[in-house]
Amino acid sequence: MRKFSLRDMKKVTLGKALFAFISSENMGLKKKSQRKEMKIHFTNLFGQSSKSVALMAQNDIMNVVRELGVNELGIYFYDHSNEPASELNSRMDGILAGVAFGDIVFVQSPSWNGIEWDRRLVDKLKLLQTKLVMFIHDVPPLMFESNYYLMPNYIDMYNQSDLVVVPSEQMYHRLVSEGLTVKKYVVQKLWDLTHSLDLYTPQFEKKLIFSGNPSRFPHIIDWKYETPLHVYTEPVEGVDYSKVHIEGWRTKQELLLELSKGGFGLVWGNSENPEDERDYYKENISYKLSTYLSAGLPVVVPDYLSNADYIREKGLGFVASSLEEANRLVQDCTEEEYAQMVRKAQYTSYLIRNGYFTKKLFVDTIMALGE
């Protein structure tokens, strides 16, 4: 049997070392050649009532972008007033577990867990060096006068983003006047309300329809116009509904089917007199409006609504300066005029039902982030 010499042993050792070196170099080349794929994430709200418009709006957005390959970051609405800092930190780490350095994150704002909670989440996202998009649904300091003192905190949070998605041009300029410094922005214009229901074709009826709780709209309960008003809401004990037709509460699917039968969907602010209306309703966009349009229903809106020009330009209904004028416009409408509005509303209904306003703002945002 041949014996191995010291020279043979050195050859074997050198060969192993060379093989190990070549292998490690190849692995390094593979790692360098494999670029990490950037992911896009959206926060999404859970834990509120199924009747909550805030929850429905965020969930509707998520349903659309999920089809585009977006990852969901679920945020639960809860009372965190007594939550220890360490537990909150762990909770947020869990929410953001799938987010990597350099990813794009859309924060649907607010989470309704309070500004401090939201700011802490944003701080964590900034540590991950994400491209941060603040998708502003509502601005609590502008919604409620009692919360206006929180405005600097919200502006501070918004200013950490790379781009803001705002409901309207009016809202962007209002936020700039409050101290917003983010230059890149995308306008949402309308909410999407996706569904695949086989709806009716709206028929001409001289009636107005109001969907939602009228408790914040005393002029709805105290209706005093010729055109009958049908209100879809859960009746509250002790409230006099004798001046309106109460239709009860409906699920989303039931409501859309009922709306598509005909009439005009009414969108109005908290005040009967437009001069008394707070600016917020003029800067935000109405989920109620998209509900009507999703059903293919012509609408009646106030002239101060942020997207009133869209309704006027597309011929989707009437734009009125008062409820008295709204009543007159409906009463003077002809069957031919109504049929023309329905035809035009069908196109916008298609866009809303299939999520095109969300898809457009999504693409516009991604493109703008790369500029």
Give the predicted meaning of each segment.
Residues R2-D79:
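N-terminal subdomain of nucleotide-sugar transferases
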Residues N82-H173:
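Extended catalytic core of nucleotide-activated donor transferases of GT-like folds
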Residues D162-V176, T181-L197:
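Donor nucleotide-sugar binding/catalytic pocket of nucleotide-sugar-dependent glycosyltransferases
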Residues W191-S260:
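Conserved catalytic-core segment of nucleotide-activated headgroup transferases in glycan assembly
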Residues Q253, L257-A295, V301-D309:
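Nucleotide-sugar-dependent
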Residues K314-A320:
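A short acidic/histidine/glycine-rich donor-binding loop in glycosyltransferase catalytic cores
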Residues S321-R328, E335-E371:
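A charged, aromatic-enriched C-terminal amphipathic alpha-helix characteristic of glycosyltransferases
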